């Protein structure tokens, strides 16, 4: 930055309003205008000293550059941010002047002991993956409280996260073998407007499919439920379940104290990686050795360019217990219904369809390759997604009137001799503008065998379909349940679930209460006879002026569901209460590097990776209060099973045992319509 001629008093190419912030300026241009300008002048004198020593400070990152970055790290002025950003880029790209540290001294010293050191230059943030969504930065520092130690959650207080629907990765390098790249984070922080959940799990990922992509037909023994799938060598993380983020006590606190909540931001860190090689020795048996040169591929599909398979209610989400080992699921997707491609050798239509079926290779994307001791992170902003409403009412929209005041509305009726008569409406039975919510109250999901029915509603395509001896209902894709805002004809139609789908465990069947608010599950009837006979509407379609509330959720519910990319849709109202999102968090994919072994055909090293993954979620919450005089119901252990959320003498954990244990929403917080 210093000019070649100190006597020159010109400002050079300084930033407007500054005396020293910019190249080719004088060292004696008057008093600095602010902190950034003063740091720039000090920086110029440092450059001048290096030039006197015969060193070129312009082509090499040097101590004076680092000092400028440090001095301006808290400067929020435009000039301060600009100067800091310029020299951070220089730090990342330019070689260091001999004798200058980039913050990687410890790693450089460790290269004498380890196969690979992690230099500080690796810490430069990479650009986030481009996103199809709007980029809207969100500062969350104002309302985030401190934890018990007085610390704010990891970096949430000092950084902005990516725009809605975008997930960016930044390789942060690491400290090498034997040095931690992050600690264990856990617990939940509650405040008036913000709740922060912090969770860490130990994960393990091994080689999938022998590093191959395969086209497979699954469930071949069951003609009705075969699936044409592409299985891949990749695995992925799935954070889409409330029990992964909230402990039972934290969830009780959330639903008892807050009337509505929604996710706002999420940070995922993958760190403390350990890649190990599995070796079999006749004398020693199986040996697990650290592999310091093997790599783990990782990236986030922030644009959703690959098939999104995080279906609501999937098992293998982040485990509920923090001490559980998370075995990551293998990534596979369904490129087309099997009914339209299974007979492609004899059916011309299916042959043409199969020619157009896509194939996705995840290696077709830029991504990081991390080694033992390294780390990375991804951020996401949920934007203005829907709220989870957590209130109830004992009134219906049709009851919003004063029963003591007469109505001016007239109703007509047929009197004696078919003469039309008119009268004022009864004060207790006056008409309303509002109708109950839509839904289909009937269905056939009551077969004795699961293979005899895929659900109450089934969607399938018939072009080229030839499934011999199998009814369409058994090969279609189910929408279930579908009663919407109406009360179902049968309890068999109700949404039921389990806390886990793990084999060898007791998995009690759970469901949310049928009605804890009078704005759902109505029964719409039509008066069909002069004597007052009525009949139920089995199919109550969407009409103007329908009023209903969203479905309640529980701790075991999924958080979001991805809205398909179509250009026509009706009102989004999920039956299970999950939040519909056009751009949910992108899938974070990982796999082991394929390291060939010479002379053994297509052989490769047998390795696996384990490490920690932490997930911090910022939740926006609201407390509205109520004018209700009477006490309200609260979720309490008094009404729960004695075995709920306990561990037995064999170390087996029991989650929710009965319906009261799931602590559903819409249980309290009375509202006025």
Curated annotation (Swiss-Prot):
The UniProt record lists the keyword Magnesium: yes
Residue ranges of the motif Nuclear localization signal: 623-634
Region (Phospholipase A2-like): 13-68
GO CC entries: host cell; host cell cytoplasm; host cell nucleus; T=1 icosahedral viral capsid
EC number(s) per entry: 3.1.1.4
Key words, A-Z: Capsid protein, Clathrin-mediated endocytosis of virus by host, Cytoplasmic inwards viral transport, Host cytoplasm, Host nucleus, Host-virus interaction, Hydrolase, Lipid degradation, Lipid metabolism, Magnesium, Metal-binding, Microtubular inwards viral transport, T=1 icosahedral capsid protein, Viral attachment to host cell, Viral penetration into host cytoplasm, Viral penetration into host nucleus, Viral penetration via permeabilization of host membrane, Virion, Virus endocytosis by host, Virus entry into host cell
Compositional bias (Polar residues): 130-144
Molecular function terms, GO-annotated: metal ion binding; phospholipase A2 activity; structural molecule activity
Record GO biological process: clathrin-dependent endocytosis of virus by host cell; lipid catabolic process; microtubule-dependent intracellular transport of viral material towards nucleus; symbiont entry into host cell via permeabilization of host membrane; viral penetration into host nucleus; virion attachment to host cell
Catalytic activity of the protein: a 1,2-diacyl-sn-glycero-3-phosphocholine + H2O = a 1-acyl-sn-glycero-3-phosphocholine + a fatty acid + H(+)
Name of the protein this chain belongs to: Minor capsid protein VP1
Originating species: Bovine parvovirus 1
């Amino acid at each position: 930055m210093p000019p070649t001629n100190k006597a020159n008093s010109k400002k050079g190419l300084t930033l407007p309003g500054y005396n020293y912030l910019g190249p080719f300026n004088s060292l004696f241009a008057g008093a600095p205008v602010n902190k950034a300008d003063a740091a720039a002048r000090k920086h110029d004198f440092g450059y001048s000293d290096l030039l006197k020593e015969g060193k070129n400070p312009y082509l090499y990152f040097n101590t004076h550059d680092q000092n400028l970055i440090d001095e301006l790290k808290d400067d929020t002025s435009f000039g301060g941010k600009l100067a800091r950003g310029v020299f951070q880029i220089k730090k990342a790209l330019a070689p260091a002047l001999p004798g200058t540290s980039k913050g990687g001294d410890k790693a450089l010293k460790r290269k004498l002991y380890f196969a690979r050191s992690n230099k500080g230059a690796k810490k430069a943030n990479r650009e986030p993956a481009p996103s199809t969504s709007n980029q809207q930065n969100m500062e969350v520092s104002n309302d985030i409280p401190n934890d018990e130690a007085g610390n704010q959650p990891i970096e949430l207080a000092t950084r902005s996260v990516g725009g809605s629907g975008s997930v960016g990765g930044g390789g942060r390098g690491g400290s090498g073998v034997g040095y931690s790249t992050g600690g264990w984070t856990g617990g939940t922080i509650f405040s008036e407007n913000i709740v922060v959940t912090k969770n860490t799990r130990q994960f393990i990922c091994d080689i999938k499919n022998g590093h191959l992509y395969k086209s497979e037909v699954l469930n071949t023994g069951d003609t009705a439920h075969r699936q044409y799938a592409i299985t891949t060598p990749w695995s992925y993380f799935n954070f889409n379940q409330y029990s992964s983020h909230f402990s039972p006590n934290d969830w009780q606190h959330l639903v008892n104290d807050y009337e509505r909540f929604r996710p706002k931001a999420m940070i995922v860190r993958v760190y403390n990686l350990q890649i190990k090689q599995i070796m079999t020795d006749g004398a020693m048996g199986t040996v697990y050795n650290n592999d310091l040169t093997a790599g783990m591929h990782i990236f986030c599909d922030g644009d959703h360019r690959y098939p999104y398979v995080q279906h609501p209610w999937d098992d293998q989400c982040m485990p509920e217990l923090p001490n559980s080992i998370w075995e990551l699921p293998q990534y596979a997707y369904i490129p087309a219904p099997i009914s339209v491609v299974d007979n492609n050798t004899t059916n011309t239509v299916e042959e043409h369809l199969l020619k157009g079926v896509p194939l996705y290779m995840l290696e077709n994307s830029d991504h990081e390759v991390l080694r033992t001791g390294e780390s990375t992170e991804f951020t996401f902003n949920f934007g203005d997604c829907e709220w989870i409403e957590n209130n109830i009412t004992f009134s219906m929209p049709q009851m919003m009137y004063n029963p003591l005041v007469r109505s001016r509305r007239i109703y007509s009726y047929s009197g004696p001799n078919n003469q039309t008569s008119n009268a004022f409406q009864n004060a207790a039975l006056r008409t309303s503008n509002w109708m109950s919510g839509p839904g289909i109250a009937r269905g056939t999901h009551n077969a004795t065998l699961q293979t005899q029915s895929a659900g109450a509603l089934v969607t399938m395509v018939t072009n080229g379909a030839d499934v011999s001896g199998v009814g369409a209902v058994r090969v279609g894709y189910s929408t279930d349940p579908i009663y919407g805002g109406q009360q179902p004809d049968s309890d068999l139609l109700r949404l039921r679930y389990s806390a886990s789908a793990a084999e060898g465990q007791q998995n009690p069947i759970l469901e949310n209460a049928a009605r804890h608010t009078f704005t759902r599950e109505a029964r719409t009837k039509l008066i069909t006879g002069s004597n007052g006979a009525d009949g139920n509407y089995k199919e109550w379609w969407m009409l103007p002026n329908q009023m209903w509330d969203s479905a309640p959720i529980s701790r075991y519910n999924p958080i979001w569901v991805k809205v398909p990319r179509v250009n026509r849709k009706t009102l989004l109202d999920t039956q299970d209460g999950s939040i519909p999102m056009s751009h949910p968090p992108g899938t974070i994919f990982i796999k082991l590097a394929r390291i060939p072994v010479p002379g053994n055909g297509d052989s490769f090293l047998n390795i696996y990776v384990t490490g920690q993954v932490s997930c911090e979620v910022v939740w926006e919450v609201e407390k509205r209060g109520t004018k209700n005089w009477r006490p309200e119901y609260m979720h309490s252990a008094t009404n729960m099973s004695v075995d709920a959320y306990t561990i037995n003498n064999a170390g087996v954990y029991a989650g929710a045992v009965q319906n009261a244990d799931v602590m559903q929403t819409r249980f309290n917080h009375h509202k006025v319509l």
